[in-house]
């Protein structure tokens, strides 16, 4: 979900009313397999990927889709049919999804819990209660979850956030570390956990720091001053962290920065590189931006690839066949590390079902498929998904 729910400010009250009234007429698609790629069945250690659809806030429409590389079949809404006794399905607003060991973890932001599943079957294991939880990171025996801590609302006195430490064996929260306001994505380098703090609920008094947590003591050892309203954070292969700032949606634009983790200082600021979401494949950082301006009352969409070895912007558009003109609201991106294929999701108007587009390494579209509502977060799996039990 975009920080502090910008999309709810950008979408008109009429559209939000339509979202509520259309819930019965346009539900999230039921479990339904569709052959989308009959021409190419891929073998290898990556069997498929899960796509977490956020779902419109307040509707409990978060859902889980799955693509099988061996069969070329995309299946929508697999969680409900595999967990028929979970009353609210996945819950309200899926915000992150990761695989660690034999478990699939999904952050369900507005339901205030992390859903833990068996990655082989997608069967529910437990829910871990964390208020206004946001993103996941893992190392050793522990999972780490960033949390806004307070209610979902813009407020000048919004609570300071924290990172929860979860024992991956007992699936219990064992510790908490206070960080900045409205913490977002996290990255681990060595024995340090870096947390991007946004302060998005405290507009215009945004946070502008990255918290550095010593994982041995699980205490915040310092804050790195970067820029206002931070969101994404991505490590490269050279000891650097790429950090995105959303700006203030008025005069201060979205930007991308590099932190050198050997000094824990900002080492580089890109000129004209807005950044909403990014993902790394080898030395190529794929990113896109959907930048809102309250001055123009309009969105500006852009794409880019950065060479993380040279810090050069290699291209300003990695989609080469014009498909980007069909993508209304890019909302998620992932790159298959084996094949170089990349995936881009389209949330459209946040009300209708979204679309997933698959592109070859050459930037030419291979296939597209309808998804759940607000398709956002993708994780590749090296575990073969077991068929549904009869």
Predicted regions mapped to residue ranges:
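Bacterial N-terminal signal peptides that target proteins for export
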Residues: 1-9
């Amino acid at each position: 979900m975009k920080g502090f729910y910008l999309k709810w400010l950008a979408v008109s009250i009429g559209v939000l009313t339509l979202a509520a009234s259309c819930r019965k007429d346009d539900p999230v698609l039921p479990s339904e397999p569709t052959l989308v790629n009959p021409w190419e069945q891929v073998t290898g250690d990556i069997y498929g990927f899960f796509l977490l659809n956020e779902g419109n806030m307040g509707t409990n429409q978060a859902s889980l889709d799955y693509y099988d590389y061996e069969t070329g079949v995309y299946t929508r809404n697999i969680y409900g049919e595999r967990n028929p006794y979970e009353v609210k399905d996945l819950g309200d607003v899926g915000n992150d999804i990761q695989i660690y060991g034999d478990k699939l973890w999904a952050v369900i932001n507005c339901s205030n819990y992390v859903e833990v599943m068996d990655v082989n079957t997608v069967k529910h294991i437990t829910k871990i209660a964390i208020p206004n939880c946001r993103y996941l990171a893992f190392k050793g025996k522990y999972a780490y979850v960033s949390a806004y801590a307070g209610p979902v609302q813009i407020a000048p006195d919004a609570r300071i956030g924290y990172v929860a430490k979860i024992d991956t064996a007992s699936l219990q929260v064992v510790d908490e570390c206070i960080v900045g306001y409205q913490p977002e994505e996290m990255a681990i380098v060595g024995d340090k956990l870096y947390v991007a703090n946004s302060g998005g609920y405290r507009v215009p008094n945004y946070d502008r720091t990255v918290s550095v947590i010593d994982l041995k003591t699980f205490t915040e050892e310092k804050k790195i001053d970067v820029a206002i309203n931070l969101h994404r954070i991505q490590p490269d292969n050279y000891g650097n962290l790429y950090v995105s700032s959303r700006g203030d949606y008025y005069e201060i634009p979205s930007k991308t920065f590099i932190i050198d983790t050997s000094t824990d200082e900002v080492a580089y600021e890109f000129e004209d590189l807005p950044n909403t979401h990014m993902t790394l494949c080898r030395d190529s950082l794929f990113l896109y931006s959907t930048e809102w301006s309250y001055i123009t009352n309009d969105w500006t969409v852009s794409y880019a690839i950065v060479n993380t070895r040279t810090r050069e912007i290699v291209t300003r558009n990695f989609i080469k066949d014009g498909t980007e003109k069909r993508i209304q609201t890019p909302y998620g991106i992932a790159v298959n590390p084996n094949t170089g294929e990349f995936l881009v999701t389209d949330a459209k108007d946040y009300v209708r079902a979204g679309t997933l587009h698959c592109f070859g390494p050459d930037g030419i579209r291979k296939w597209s498929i309808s998804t759940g509502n607000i398709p956002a977060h993708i994780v590749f799996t090296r575990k073969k998904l077991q068929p549904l039990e009869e």
